[in-house]
């Protein structure tokens, strides 16, 4: 169950209270392969919505947040790499280039469901073959969209960010808290 925040409180109080609200992490059984979309941003919003509603159905009365992130390289979606070669392929494509990171967030209380997508443009410095090989030999790229963790070693490759850093990490915190306040 979810601990609520008094609706009589000011928005500032609500937002501060959300940092201390108890929550439980639930893994969704949503089948991501069923989702089709015209754009990477639409895809990630539908994935977040599917995950959110799958968990919401199992936890009636709870406020559920679902989220997903994809890396968009000229319209090609980079999810989590499936192999070392896949990780290297993604990193070569990101090297010295700009790409978009889209994070979809969906919140539902079982009655009402709202969602949004936040996007951020990221530019990497050129990466050497040795850097790519070394990074692909670590565990870091394999559970991350686009084969990199911006808060990890990939921070060294960062030339420019246009947008919310937390969108790249997978949860645009301030926008999520603003939307979550509507459910409290």
Predicted regions and their residues:
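Single conserved hydrophobic/aromatic residue that forms the stacking wall/gate
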Residues: 1-9, 13
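Cofactor-binding loop segments of dinucleotide-utilizing enzymes, especially the Rossmann-like FAD-
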Residues: 7-8, 28, 110
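Short loop/helix-cap segments at secondary-structure boundaries that form the rim of catalytic
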Residues: 15-18, 35-36, 57-58
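Short polar/charged helix/loop
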Residues: 18-19, 72
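Glycine-centered loop/turn motif at secondary-structure junctions
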Residues: 19-20, 184
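Short glycine-rich, Thr/Ser-proximal phosphate-binding strand/loop in the N-terminal lobe
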Residues: 20-37, 113-119
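Anionic-ligand binding patches
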Residues: 38-184
């Amino acid at each position: 169950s979810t601990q609520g925040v008094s609706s009589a409180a000011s928005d500032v109080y609500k937002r501060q209270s959300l940092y201390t609200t108890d929550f439980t992490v639930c893994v969704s059984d949503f089948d991501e392969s069923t989702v089709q979309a015209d754009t990477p941003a639409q895809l990630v919003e539908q994935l977040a919505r599917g995950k959110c509603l799958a968990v919401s159905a199992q936890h009636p009365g709870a406020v559920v947040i679902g989220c997903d992130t994809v890396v968009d390289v000229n319209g090609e979606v980079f999810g989590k790499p499936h192999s070392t070669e896949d990780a290297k392929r993604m990193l070569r494509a990101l090297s010295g280039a700009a790409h978009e990171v889209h994070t979809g967030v969906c919140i539902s209380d079982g009655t009402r469901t709202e969602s949004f997508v936040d996007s951020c443009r990221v530019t990497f410095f050129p990466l050497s073959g040795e850097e790519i090989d070394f990074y692909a030999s670590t565990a870091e790229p394999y559970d991350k969209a686009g084969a990199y963790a911006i808060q990890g070693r990939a921070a060294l490759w960062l030339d420019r960010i246009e947008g919310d850093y937390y969108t790249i990490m997978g949860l645009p915190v301030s926008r999520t808290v603003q939307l979550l306040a509507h459910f409290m």
